[in-house]
Amino acid sequence: MIQALRGMKDIFSPESERFVYIIDTASKIARRYGYRYIETPLLEETALFKRSVGESSDIVGKEMYQFIDKGGHDVCLRPEGTAGAVRAFIQNKMDRKGGVHRFYYHGPMFRYERPQKGRLREFHQFGCESFGLESVYEDFTIILMIKDIFDTLGIDYTIKINSLGCPECMPDYKESLITHLNDIRDGLCEDCQRRTETNPIRVLDCKVQECQAMLQNSPVIVENLCKACDSDFKRLQSLLTSHSIKYELDSKLVRGLDYYTKTAFEFVSGEVGAQNAIAGGGRYDRLVEFLGGKPTPAIGFALGIERIMELVKLPESEREGIYLGVMEEEAIDKILKIAHRKRATERVYVEYSKRSLKAHLKAADRVGARFCAVIGEDELKNSQIWLKDLQTKEERRVGIEEF
């Protein structure tokens, strides 16, 4: 028997109901914040992610589904959504139009990594990208939007924030960090020793406990910010505090992608296993220019749908729609016509098989229909339909035309 590949799964009800509910809820809130839906390809040039995510990142170095296609092009399945959104933004010349552009998207991403709780090789993200505003108020609004999404979904979380500085203050910090890392190099894991040479900031993000212990006295980014970055970060904290939004400062929060600058944030939950981030993002003011576009400030985030599915409780749904059934085969044509007419405004379930009234009532209850409508021998003779409201338990017969 052929089975789904490791780390990839099918989604059936009731899981699929939660899946759709999460996307619908996040989409509705994003639209309220002025975001418009976009769709980008699953397949992109590998160079896009090497340039944006960074060749030294784990995603590019270890995790991409990468291959040469029949045309000889080096392509890969997208491992994340921001790079494709930025590529689309530039390709469609939106960087030349000026103004503010806000987009949201959702869909599958692919990373070849070890499957574990809340982490699959094919996983789904909901993301938002805002282009054109270099403002701490936009940073705050993005965090507020994610908060609204999780509050609506009934998910508990902790907000963590950090600043990654800018081209003015990051070089000096990186130099002092490298000096410190070289001093403790022998106590670091192999990955961190490699990152010390290729991408020292990522060492701070290592999950190995021994490395974290060695990093206790490492230089702190927010203590090395330039005047502008320091002012913005303090303003962000002030906004969060004034709106009674609790947060934690996390000097080790650097995110896993190379394109982030200034504000970085994560929403974390202790209920999703070792990989406890359920949403994350930050500012990437240089990425549009780096990928060939006109310099454009930007900020974005993504939340992992599989990560939060177990945390979401669906609201209790009322019965909905009409179940149509027959007790005589001659009535099938009539219920097909009724179903076609009713589907203009109602959800309709049709059972084509001849069944007893008791069997139809059980089936209507099973699909959650509000009404069970059945045509039997007597109803057929009198051009009527038997109708039961499964919520109020009221029963009656009505004319087919009237119904």
Question: Where in this protein do the model-derived segments appear?
Answer:
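TRNA-recognition modules of translation machinery and tRNA-sensing kinases, especially anticodon-binding
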Residues: 1-402
